[in-house]
């Protein structure tokens, strides 16, 4: 082998090593591990031509993938111009990829319901609509993701879905054979029935269809290794709440209420479902907890004491401490942030609302799933 050939081989090896550090923005795995590198060609002078496979031709992240590949190669000493060409996986390659990601199981399983799952699952519930449950969900999820954790949001409010709008996303999921790849928005994986409907078309489904949709979102969607999954439930204790308890029995309930005592009574019923489903209540969040005035005082527009009342009554009902995790002030900026699709924890984190949401998120993200029933891979017979 000539010195030129040897140099080219060394450079190709270095480029391959660099590509192993390029993470696919949707699958969150190295592109080399996913079989996405088609070819690496080294030309005289250090010019590099690399071919990359996309899962589908209309991949919404193809520009991002191309940029990441180009940058990774350009940082390799000895490389000159970089040319990236994109191709599309064959059906056989997609099947191989799906098996690598999900295994060869004929029936997809719900990963979060498995005994060895370390994902913390929070179901955000409320007794009635209009208390800001979805607003709390998107802000807590985004705040936790900003802390570096892998987070997913499942919009389980099939009839009243609003998560895509509040996250500022109109992306559609990618279908990879029988597997669904959710869009990633603000570093959060998001799935909603609203991503599959046209315009503002209503979803007119009854119980069995709702259960099946939820089951598919949990099993057919490739969530990857999540630290936290948040489900935005519809108000009340209907079909979806029951299905969640059946499909993910380890899910913990986060109750959202307003300070109004009448609303608190309804929220208490939403939390009391834990008595029947044997789920754990992680805590209560009081939203719209007074309007901050210019002089620093707080105007109690919707009364006061509702959140504390729910926490105390649920504590007595379940026999364990149910804390009041936080009280989020009433702020028009929070509404505007939801309409704009940029959660307030991202664009106004120093505001009273932003600070309180971040404080609640810190409490939830610092809690680890209990290891009861989880195999640690230890064999006491081995020394």
From Swiss-Prot:
- Residues bound to ATP are 127-134
Disulphide connectivity of cysteines: none
**Keywords of this protein's UniProt record, alphabetized?**
ATP-binding, Hydrolase, Iron, Iron-sulfur, Metal-binding, Nucleotide-binding
Top-level taxon in the UniProt lineage? Bacteria
**BP-aspect Gene Ontology terms:** iron-sulfur cluster assembly
Q: Record keywords: Hydrolase included?
A: yes
Coiled coil (UniProt feature): none
GO MF annotations, alphabetized:
4 iron, 4 sulfur cluster binding; ATP binding; ATP hydrolysis activity; ATP-dependent FeS chaperone activity; metal ion binding
The cross-references to InterPro entries, in alphabetical order and at most eight, read: FSCA_dom_sf, MIP18-like, Mrp-like_CS, Mrp/NBP35_ATP-bd, NUBPL-like, P-loop_NTPase, YlxH/NBP35
Q: Which family does it belong to?
A: In the N-terminal section; belongs to the MIP18 family. In the C-terminal section; belongs to the Mrp/NBP35 ATP-binding proteins family.
The UniProt function text for this chain reads: Binds and transfers iron-sulfur (Fe-S) clusters to target apoproteins. Can hydrolyze ATP.
User: What subunit structure does UniProt give?
Assistant: Homodimer.
Query: Under what name is this protein listed?
Result: Iron-sulfur cluster carrier protein
Q: Which organism is it from?
A: Mycobacterium leprae (strain TN)
């Amino acid at each position: 082998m000539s010195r030129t050939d040897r140099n080219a081989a060394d450079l190709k090896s270095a480029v391959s090593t660099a590509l192993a550090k390029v993470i696919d923005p949707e699958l969150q795995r190295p592109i080399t591990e996913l079989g996405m590198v088609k070819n690496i060609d080294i030309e005289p002078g250090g010019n590099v031509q690399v071919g990359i496979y996309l899962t589908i031709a209309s991949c919404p992240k193809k520009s991002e993938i191309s940029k990441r590949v180009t940058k990774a190669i350009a940082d390799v000493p000895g490389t000159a111009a970089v040319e990236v060409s994109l191709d599309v996986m064959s059906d056989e390659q997609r099947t191989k990829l799906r098996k690598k990601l999900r295994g060869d199981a004929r029936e997809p399983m719900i990963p979060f319901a498995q005994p060895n799952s370390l994902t913390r699952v929070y179901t955000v519930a409320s007794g009635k609509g209009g208390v800001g449950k979805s607003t709390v969900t998107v802000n807590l999820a985004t705040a936790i993701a900003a802390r570096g954790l892998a987070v997913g949001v499942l919009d389980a409010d099939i009839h009243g879905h609003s998560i895509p709008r509040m996250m500022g996303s109109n992306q559609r999921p990618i279908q990879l054979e029988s597997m669904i790849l959710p869009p990633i928005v603000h570093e959060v994986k998001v799935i909603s029935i609203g991503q599959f409907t046209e315009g503002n078309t209503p979803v007119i489904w009854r119980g069995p269809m709702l259960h099946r949709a939820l089951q598919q979102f949990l099993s057919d969607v490739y969530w990857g290794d999540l630290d936290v999954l948040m489900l935005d439930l519809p108000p009340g204790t209907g079909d979806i709440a029951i299905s969640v308890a059946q499909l993910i029995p380890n899910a913990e309930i986060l109750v959202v209420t307003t300070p109004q005592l009448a609303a608190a009574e309804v929220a208490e019923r939403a939390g009391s479902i834990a008595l029947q489903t044997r789920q754990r209540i992680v805590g209560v969040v009081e939203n719209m907890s007074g309007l901050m005035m210019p002089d620093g005082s707080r105007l109690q527009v919707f009364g006061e004491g509702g959140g504390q009342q729910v926490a105390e009554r649920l504590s007595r009902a379940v026999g364990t401490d149910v804390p009041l995790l936080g009280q989020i002030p009433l702020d028009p900026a929070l509404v505007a942030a939801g309409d704009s699709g940029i959660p307030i924890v991202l664009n106004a984190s120093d505001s009273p609302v932003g600070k309180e949401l971040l404080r609640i998120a810190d409490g939830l993200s610092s809690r680890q799933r209990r290891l009861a029933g989880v195999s640690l891979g230890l064999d006491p017979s081995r020394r």
